[in-house]
């Protein structure tokens, strides 16, 4: 088992990475929570696989469990689902001494975490991510959010959990496309870190190679993200580097109208931001092909879909990374050498036009 300690200004907790940890969840939870009501929030994809196991584990450990299921998919990151979950918590008389356990991928983690952060001004939270994407990204760092029609993650909070439990064994139930999606976030982390982490990706030459390497790749990604979060919990400085690939990625994902998974859109964003900054003389052109090779090895998309650059620029104006009159971008001058770069909102259409012209 790998234990990664996270110490922020308001909370100290552990991220436990262990094969078959779901079968020991009751024991793990009793180390941070006393007996209480627990709302296990899951979705229609994950629930049939793991809700009973988690319920049995928690019940045997002395917890009173209520399973609350939301529809699978990004559409559940909505005000209507927030209202539904809060109504269920209230009807079941959940108090501030009770807790929420998020059992699912990034959507469930974001949604359940946000609900936990606002119900009664905050109740206890545990994250149990079940997708590779959530295990390496959204379950770590305390970001919670729902979407608005104008953009992703525009309403949310910073809310740290009491515990994160990551079980790489459950990844065997994921289809290849979801494994590849999560790997896109691993490539992002490795590109930011460089060194041995980046070199380790050369062994991943297909989707099939992800599973055997998953425990080590997850641990490296989580350790990196935990270090960044501890240094900058509320994204005022270096935590912004974790948005590498997400500026273009979020816009493309929204405009693709459900045709792209989050990690797929980020993969496109990683390659295209390298291409964009190379066109402006701030990054070597070789970096684009380097990242592209790592992503294409598992079948991730890297090319821009058929959407207008003006539409992408319009979406970016609502990006949460806009500060004043500028949108903060992340680019690499080399693997392991990230930088922040503000672009005026009024210049976004021109920059996107430049990107489309060199694509």
Curated annotation (Swiss-Prot):
EC number(s) stated in the UniProt entry for this protein: 4.2.3.4
Location in the cell: Cytoplasm
UniProt cross-references to CDD domains, sorted A to Z: DHQS (cd08195)
InterPro entries: Dehydroquinate_synthase, DHQ_synth_AroB, DHQ_synth_fam, DHQS/DOIS_N, DHQS_C
Cofactor note: Binds 1 divalent metal cation per subunit. Can use either Co(2+) or Zn(2+).
Gene Ontology BP term (one): chorismate biosynthetic process
Catalytic activity reported: 7-phospho-2-dehydro-3-deoxy-D-arabino-heptonate = 3-dehydroquinate + phosphate
Keywords noted in UniProt: Amino-acid biosynthesis, Aromatic amino acid biosynthesis, Cobalt, Cytoplasm, Lyase, Metal-binding, NAD, Nucleotide-binding, Zinc
Binding site for Zn(2+): 185, 246, 262
Binding site for NAD(+): 106-110, 130-131, 143, 152
Pathway annotation from the record: Metabolic intermediate biosynthesis; chorismate biosynthesis; chorismate from D-erythrose 4-phosphate and phosphoenolpyruvate: step 2/7
Enzyme class, first EC level, given as a word: lyase
First-listed, main subcellular location of the protein, grouped into a coarse class: cytoplasm
NCBIfam families: aroB
PANTHER family for the chain: 3-DEHYDROQUINATE SYNTHASE (PTHR43622), 3-DEHYDROQUINATE SYNTHASE, CHLOROPLASTIC (PTHR43622:SF7)
Name under which the protein is recorded: 3-dehydroquinate synthase
Gene source species: Lactiplantibacillus plantarum (strain ATCC BAA-793 / NCIMB 8826 / WCFS1)
Designated gene of the protein: aroB
């Amino acid at each position: 088992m790998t234990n990664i300690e996270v110490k922020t200004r308001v909370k100290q907790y552990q991220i436990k990475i262990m094969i078959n940890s779901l079968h020991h969840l009751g024991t793990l939870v009793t180390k941070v929570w006393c007996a209480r009501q627990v709302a296990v929030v899951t979705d229609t994809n994950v629930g049939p696989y793991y809700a009973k196991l988690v319920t049995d584990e928690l019940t045997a450990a002395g917890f009173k469990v209520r399973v609350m299921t939301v529809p699978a998919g990004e559409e559940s990151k909505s005000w209507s689902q927030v209202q539904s979950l809060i109504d269920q918590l209230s009807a079941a008389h959940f108090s501030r001494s009770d807790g929420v356990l998020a059992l699912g991928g990034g959507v469930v983690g974001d949604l359940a975490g946000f609900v936990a952060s606002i119900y009664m001004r905050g109740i206890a939270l545990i994250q149990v991510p079940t997708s590779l994407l959530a295990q390496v990204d959204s379950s770590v760092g305390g970001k919670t959010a729902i979407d608005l029609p104008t953009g992703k993650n525009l309403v949310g909070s910073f809310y740290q959990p009491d515990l994160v439990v990551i079980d790489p064994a459950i990844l065997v139930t994921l289809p290849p496309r979801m494994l590849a999606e999560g790997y896109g976030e691993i490539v992002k982390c490795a590109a930011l870190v460089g060194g041995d982490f980046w070199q380790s990706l050369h062994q991943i030459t297909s989707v099939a190679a992800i599973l055997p390497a998953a425990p080590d790749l997850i641990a490296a990604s989580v350790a990196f993200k935990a270090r960044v979060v501890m240094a900058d919990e509320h994204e005022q400085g270096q935590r912004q580097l974790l948005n590498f690939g997400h500026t273009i990625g979020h816009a493309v994902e929204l405009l693709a109208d459900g045709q792209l998974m989050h990690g797929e859109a980020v993969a496109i964003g990683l390659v295209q931001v390298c291409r964009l900054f190379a066109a402006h003389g701030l990054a070597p052109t070789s970096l684009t092909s380097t990242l592209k090779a790592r992503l294409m090895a598992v079948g991730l998309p890297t090319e821009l879909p058929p959407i207008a650059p003006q539409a992408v620029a319009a979406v970016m104006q609502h990006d949460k990374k806009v500060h004043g009159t500028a949108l903060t971008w992340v680019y690499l001058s080399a693997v392991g050498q990230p930088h922040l770069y503000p672009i005026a909102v009024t210049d976004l259409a021109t920059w996107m036009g430049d990107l489309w012209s060199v694509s």
